[in-house]
């Protein structure tokens, strides 16, 4: 939840969720 994955999740889910990223405040974060 602290490291930005460089991906937004406004319209689509985080593709980077496969590496542990999750959506928070319309941006994908890791940890």
Curated annotation (Swiss-Prot):
Q: Which GO terms describe its biological process?
A: defense response
Key words of the record: Disulfide bond, Knottin, Plant defense
In terms of InterPro entries, this protein maps to: Cyclotide, Cyclotide_bracelet_CS, Cyclotide_sf
What the entry lists under PROSITE patterns is as follows: CYCLOTIDE, CYCLOTIDE_BRACELET
Q: Where is this cross-link: Cyclopeptide (Gly-Asn)?
A: 1-31
Pfam families in alphabetical order: Cyclotide
Tissue expression pattern: Expressed in pedicel, root and stem but not in leaf and fruit (at protein level).
Cystines in this chain: 5-21, 9-23, 14-28
Note the superkingdom of the native organism: Eukaryota
Task: Please report the PTM annotation for this entry.
Answer: This is a cyclic peptide.
Q: What does this protein do?
A: Probably participates in a plant defense mechanism.
What the entry says about domains is:
The presence of a 'disulfide through disulfide knot' structurally defines this protein as a knottin.
Family membership, please give it: Belongs to the cyclotide family. Bracelet subfamily.
What name has this protein been given in UniProt? Chassatide C5
What is the species listed in this Swiss-Prot or TrEMBL entry? Chassalia chartacea
